[in-house]
Design a protein with these regions (language model features):
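Contiguous, well-folded functional domains in the mature portion of proteins
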Residues: 1-218
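Ser/Thr-rich, Proline-interspersed low-complexity disordered segments
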Residues: 220-249
Length: 250
C-alpha cells in the first residue's frame, strides 16, 4: 500500500524502532496469564488471539522486558538504555505454539487502505514488525513485533523489493491473512501504542474475547506518555502515492 507519511530517519534494519534485536530484552519473573489493569480500554485494539488460526488463548511460556533506547548517545543513532519497567513491567511475551503452525495478523476492525488492516514496517527471516497505520514510523497507532518466527518467503521478498525502492510503498496484510509460521514450540510478541511498549497480557485490550478468564488484577500504571520520536532524516522525501501493491498470500 502507499506509505502515507512519517519517516524512520534510519534504514529499517538499523532502527531500534523497527528492528527489535537492536534493543534486545531480558527475562523477568511475572505472572504468566491474563491480567486486569485499570485505566482506559483501547477501542479496536489488535487482538493477539487472532495470530493463531483458529483464534485462541495460548499458554504463556515466559515474560520479558524490552530495553529502552537512548537517542542521545554518541555516535548516532544512540545506544541501548535500561530495561523498561514503567509504565509496564512486562513488555514482551513468549507464547506456546506447535512447530509448523501458521501465524496470522492480529485482527483489527479499522482498515488502513481498502481491506488491509496492517502494514509491514520491517521483516527479516525470523522477525516481523507490523504497524496498524500507513505511517513509516511507530510513533502513531499500534505496532506489533514478532520474534523467533519464520516469515513467509513471498512476503519477505516483497518487503525487500519495496524497501530497496525507497519505501514509498510497503506490503500490507488483511485480517485472517497468513504471514508466516512458528518453527519451534513458542514465539515472542510485543505490542506498542504510540511508541510505548504495552503489557501484552492485558485482557481488556489485546484479549477481549477471553476477559472471563482474567482473574488476576494489577495496579494501574502511571500515565503513559507517547514515545520520543526517532530523529528524521534531514533529506527524507515526502511519501508519494503510487499504485498500491498487494501482498501475495504466503
Amino acid at each position: 500500500v502507499p506509505v502515507e507519511g512519517g519517516s524512520l530517519g534510519l534504514p529499517a534494519d538499523k532502527s531500534p524502532d523497527t528492528n527489535l534485536s537492536l534493543r534486545g530484552y531480558r527475562p523477568t519473573t511475572a505472572y504468566l496469564g491474563l491480567i486486569n489493569i485499570g485505566g482506559d480500554t483501547h477501542d479496536d485494539a489488535p487482538q493477539l488471539a487472532a495470530a493463531f488460526g483458529p483464534p485462541r488463548l495460548p499458554a504463556f511460556a515466559a515474560a520479558f522486558q524490552v530495553y529502552d533506547w537512548n537517542w542521545n548517545c554518541s555516535p548516532p543513532p544512540g545506544c541501548r538504555g535500561d530495561a523498561l519497567t514503567t509504565p509496564y513491567s512486562v513488555t514482551l511475551l513468549e507464547m506456546r505454539t506447535t512447530p509448523g503452525e501458521q501465524l496470522l495478523v492480529p485482527s483489527r476492525k479499522q482498515p488502513i487502505y481498502g481491506s488491509f488492516v496492517a502494514m509491514v514496517l520491517y521483516a527479516e527471516e525470523r522477525r516481523l514488525t507490523l504497524t496498524y497505520t500507513r505511517d513509516d514510523s511507530p510513533a502513531n497507532g499500534y505496532v506489533v513485533h514478532f520474534e523467533d518466527v519464520v516469515v513467509a518467503p513471498e512476503l519477505l521478498a516483497l518487503y525487500r523489493q519495496l524497501n530497496a525502492a525507497g519505501r514509498k510503498e510497503l506490503p500490507a496484510l488483511r485480517n485472517g491473512e497468513v504471514w508466516g509460521m512458528a518453527d519451534k514450540a513458542s514465539f515472542k510478541a510485543a505490542i506498542r501504542d504510540r511508541g510505548t511498549f504495552m503489557d501484552p497480557r492485558t485482557c481488556k485490550d489485546w484479549w477481549v474475547d477471553y476477559r472471563s478468564q482474567c482473574t488476576v488484577s494489577m495496579a494501574r500504571p502511571a500515565a503513559v506518555f507517547p514515545m520520543q520520536p526517532s530523529p528524521a532524516a534531514p533529506t527524507a522525501p515526502t511519501a508519494a502515492m503510487p499504485v498500491p501493491v498487494q501482498t501475495p498470500q504466503p
